[in-house]
Structures are given as C-alpha cells and as structure tokens.
Amino acid sequence: MASVVVKTIWQSKEIHEAGDPPAGVESRAQLVPEAPGGVTSPAKGITKKKKAVSFHGVEPRMSHEPMHWCLNLKRSSACTNVSLLNLAAVEPDSSGTDSTTEDSGPLALPGPPASPTTPWAPEDPDITELLSGVNSGLVRAKDSITSLKEKTTRVNQHVQTLQSECSVLSENLERRRQEAEELEGYCSQLKGPRPDVLTQENCRKVTRSVEDAEIKTNVLKQNSALLEEKLRYLQQQLQDETPRRQEAELQELEQKLEAGLSRHGLSPATPIQGCSGPPGSPEEPPRQRGLSSSGWGMAVRTGEGPSLSEQELQKVSTGLEELRREVSSLAARWHQEEGAVQEALRLLGGLGGRLDGFLGQWERAQREQAQSARGLQELRGRADELCTMVERSAVSVASLRSELEALGPVKPILEELGRQLQNSRRGADHVLNLDRSAQGPCARCASQGQQLSTESLQQLLERALTPLVDEVKQKGLAPACPSCQRLHKKILELERQALAKHVRAEALSSTLRLAQDEAVRAKNLLLTDKMKPEEKVATLDYMHLKMCSLHDQLSHLPLEGSTGAMGGGSNGGAPPKRGSPGSEQ
C-alpha cells in the first residue's frame, strides 16, 4: 500500500479564511508537532482547542491551469483534536502530522512544486497597508471634493449676491442718471431767458434733488467700498483654494498607487511566476511531492487573497475614475464660475467708471451751486443797498413835497416882502448917504453901518411882515405902477415854476413808487433765490442806473427850486437902480 498524506483543516470559519492570512503575518511558518492526548500546543497566539476534520484524495487539474484547481475533498472517518498547522510550510515535519497507510493502488495524490512562494516578499509592505493608504487618500480626496463643492456653492452664492448688488447698483445709477437729467433740465430752465417762469417749487425741487443725490452718492460710495472688500476677500479665497491643488493631490495619489502596483507586480499571473513548475513534476522525490501537495492546496487557498485585492483595486480604479470625472466637472464649473466672476468684475469696473463720471458731474454741479450762492449773496447785499437808497430818496421826496406844499401861501408874503424890501432899501440908502456925508469915508464904520442896516432890515421885516400880508390879503388890488406890474409878472412866473415843480414832484413821486415796487419785487426774487447771476447783475445794473437818475433828479430839483425861488424873490424884491423908471416914479 502506498503512503497517503493526510492534512488537518479547521472545521470553523478559518476554513474559508485559510488563504487570507492577517496583515503583518507574512512569514514562513513551521510545523508544530501534535501533542499526545489530543492537546494542542499554542501556535500563532491561538490557545483554544478546536475540532478538526481530516480530508484526503486531493486531485489536481491539468498542468496548464495551475491557478484554478478544483478541490475534490473526501471526509475521512477519523476525527481528532489537533493543533493548528501551517499548511504553507516548506519543510514539513512528518512526526506529528503525517500518517501513512498502505494501499494496493498507485499513488493517488501527486505533489505540487517543492518550494511554493508567496506573492509578497517578507521585506515588501503589506497589500493592506497600501490599500489602507489608497483608501485614506480617497477619503481625503472625497473630503477635499466636498469642501471644494461647498466652496463653489459659497462662491456661487457670493456671485449671486454680487449680481444682485450689481443690478441694484445699475438701477440706482439709472435713477441717478434720470435725476441728473432732470437736474440738467432744471439748470437749463434756470439759465433760460424767462426768469419769471421760475417759481419757488422749482428751487425746492432742485434743492431736494441735490440733497437726495448727495445721500445716494454717499450710499453708492459705501456700497462700492463693501463690494471691493468682498471681491478682495473672494479673490484671496480663490487664490488660496484652487482645484489645481486637488488635481495635484489626486495625481500624486495615482502615481503612488501605480508605483506600488508596478513594484510588487500585482497581476493574475504573478503567483504563477513564483512557482517552479506544475504539480506532479518528475524532478521531485515522492516524499517531497506528497508533503507539498497539501501545501499547494494551501497556496490555492492563499491565491484567493490576490483576487480579493484585485477586486479592491478595481474598486479603487473605478473610484479614481469617478473622482477624475468629478474633478473635471468641478474644473469646468469652476471655469464657468470664474468667467461669471470676471464678468461681474468687468461690470463693477464699468460701474466704477460711470460712478466716477457721475461724481465729476456732481462736483461740477456743486461748484456751480456755490458760485450761484455767492452771486445770490452779493445780489442780496446790493438789493439791501438799493432798498436803503430808495428809502432815503423817498424821505427826500417827502420832504421836497412838504416844502413845495409850503410854497403855496408864501406867494403873497413874497410880494409884500419885495415891496417892503424896496422901501427898506430906499430908506437904508438914504440913511447911509446921510451917515457917509456926516462921518466921512471909514471902512470900519461902513461895515458897522452895514451890520446895523441888516439888523434893522431884519427888524423892520419882522415888524412890517404881518400887517403887510394882512393888507394884501384884504385889498388884493392890482398894481398900477410898472414896477408892480413887473413884480406881478415875476410872481406869475414863480407860480408857473412852482406848478411845474409840483408836477415834476408828482412825477418823481410816481417814479419813486414804481422804483419802490421794483425794489420790493427784486428783494423778493433775491429772497427766493431764483435768479441767475447774469440776470441778477443785469437787474442790479438797471436798478443802479435808475437810482442814479432819480438821485440826479432829486439833487437838481431842490437846488432849482431854491435858486428859482430865491432868484425870483431877489429879482422881484430887489430895488431898482437909481435913475431907473421905477425909482423916478
């Protein structure tokens, strides 16, 4: 009978995990002899007794299919408690685990190669470590993708807020433009040739629009400053967090994975290359083949590990492909959002340019308003001066009118005064002649005599004035002598002159009333601030010329009246020269 090798495989879940050794336990194990009495010695950290079952009759497949063996296991009747055996041992020990039986038939179980090798060398890192690194890289990549998605959503929200703010700013600018056009219309209306059309409502509208424009300009400045700060923050954030960094990390992870796979040669044909030949090669002794047959079965069990790792690698590759697709889609979305941000920046640049233009126009309007305010102040000052001049002229005209009215009852007094002056002159001349003949020619005495004569003349005038006036009023007789006729003519001329002066005074009073009305109207216009500087200057020039003409008339009128009155009185009251017809009469 031929000797048959019997191996013990655990009847537990380790029978399915025999080909998957735990991570870090990748070394060549030794066979442990079976203790007598079925008590197993501790090996590989396992101390519990387990029930085992024996199998025999392992049949290999053809030699050209070394990795896809089908196990044809038959359960034996022997059931014992044995220790855990390393089924992948290279140098087996037949003292504790092998049992031989005699059989008349040929050898039923040919052995695999003498030295089956594991797919990983002892000094190489474990596939689990590489897969854990790949999984951690994938987790980090997914986390970075989620963070990038969150950041892109935040960027989209910022872009939407910026677009809404830009739309609001454009609406505000459109409104400002309309208000600026209205303001220009008001300014053109203010500069128009019809100042009487301007009312107080227009000025109030202009002031309200100017104040609203100031407030809205300040709001626009604040909004533009906030937008600039937000854009700077977004640019810094986008510069700090870009998808290129994520792509670089993914490429580095792929390079590491490919380098690890290429270095360890993970492929379906790798375990085959590690074998020296198919099972049943005639170069090996029968004992060796018999012992290594069960070891080849263990190699088949351990061959399930690379298949599982291949599935994990396929999962990793599919995950990497999905990650690449997501990164490419994110990059495309990022480029679209970057274009939207560039468009928003361009719109903001145009908005800033339009805002600068509007601010320039606003500054020019402010300067023009300041100039108009200064012109209004000057116009108010000149109007106040004009009002004072008009008031003074009104006072002078009133005094002139009172004086002219007082000239009416003076006519008979002047007539009687002329007569009395003639009589007094005659008497004074006679007295002076007598004094000169008596005293002789002395200048001092002559001057004293003149003083005495003037004093006496005043006294005589005061004494004789009232009875003469009464007599003239009572009699009213026409003069008969030529001197009286001349005096009467002069008195009539004086009456005509007084009447003409009265008419002129009435005309002057009417013109003064008109000037007062115009001054009041100009003052009201100045108070309402509706006139342009050119109109104010023209009005002031016109009023100044008018006031100058009025002053000239007023200055000439009292002088003419006084000189006329005095001239008439002197001419009418002067005594005729000696030798004249009046003196002879």
Swiss-Prot record:
Q: What species is given as this protein's source? A: Mus musculus (Mouse)
The annotated regions of Low complexity compositional bias extend over 91-108
Q: Name one GO molecular function term.
A: protein kinase binding
- InterPro entries linked to this entry: TSKS
Q: Could you tell me what this protein is called? A: Testis-specific serine kinase substrate
Where is it mostly found?
cytoplasm
Keywords associated with the record: Cytoplasm, Cytoplasmic vesicle, Cytoskeleton, Phosphoprotein
User: What does this gene product do?
Assistant: May play a role in testicular physiology, most probably in the process of spermatogenesis or spermatid development.
The protein's PTM annotation reads: Phosphorylated on serine residue(s) by STK22A/TSSK1 and STK22B/TSSK2.
Taken from the UniProt entry, a GO cellular component term is: centriole
